[in-house]
């Protein structure tokens, strides 16, 4: 998908180094030691082939969406745009493309987590007509104590 100088394309494992550099450049971005390492991102991409996307501008990755599903519903992870490229509707273009790909799989619902302190992200999702689900609490059970979260400062 091309729009001006932005290309939205499938994320490949060969993008990992550049994608990780982007994630590490975004203030407040949460990276997990195990889940976000090369091996686990490769496993995710292989399991959900063709669903994750990157935005490319001037031959540089400036946005990502990790997208996968379990057969019932999809989840978006690590939706981000380089802070220098915000305001260009890159996130909107990536979301549209990722939704089309999930829809083609016959999935009718997508969820995501937007951390409460991510004000820009929460404003974005509301502007895209996503509804905050106030009926649920989110829980997690850490099975690998080495899978610690770090937040980019």
Write out the residue ranges for each language-model feature.
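A short beta-loop-alpha structural element at the N-terminal edge
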Residues: 6-19
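A short helix-loop-beta-strand connector motif used in the catalytic cores of GNAT acetyltransferases and
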Residues: 42-54, 75
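A conserved beta-turn-beta hairpin within the catalytic core of GNAT-like acetyltransferases
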Residues: 68-77, 86, 133-135
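Conserved acetyl-CoA-binding loop-helix of GNAT-fold acetyltransferases
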Residues: 81, 87-100, 127
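Conserved GNAT acetyl-CoA-binding A-motif
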Residues: 102-114
């Amino acid at each position: 998908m091309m729009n001006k100088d932005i290309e939205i394309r499938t994320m490949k494992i060969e993008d990992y180094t550049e994608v990780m550099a982007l994630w590490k450049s975004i203030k407040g971005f949460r990276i997990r030691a195990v889940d976000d390492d090369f091996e686990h991102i490769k496993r995710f991409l292989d399991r959900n082939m063709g669903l994750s996307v990157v935005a490319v501008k001037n031959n540089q990755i400036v946005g990502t969406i990790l997208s996968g599903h379990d057969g019932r519903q999809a989840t978006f992870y690590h939706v981000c745009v380089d802070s220098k490229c915000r305001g260009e509707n890159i996130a909107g273009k990536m979301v549209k493309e990722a939704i089309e790909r999930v829809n083609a799989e016959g999935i009718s619902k997508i969820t995501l987590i937007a951390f409460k302190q991510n004000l820009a992200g929460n404003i974005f999702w509301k502007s895209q007509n996503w509804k905050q689900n106030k009926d649920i609490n989110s829980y997690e059970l850490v099975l690998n104590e080495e899978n610690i979260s770090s937040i980019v400062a």
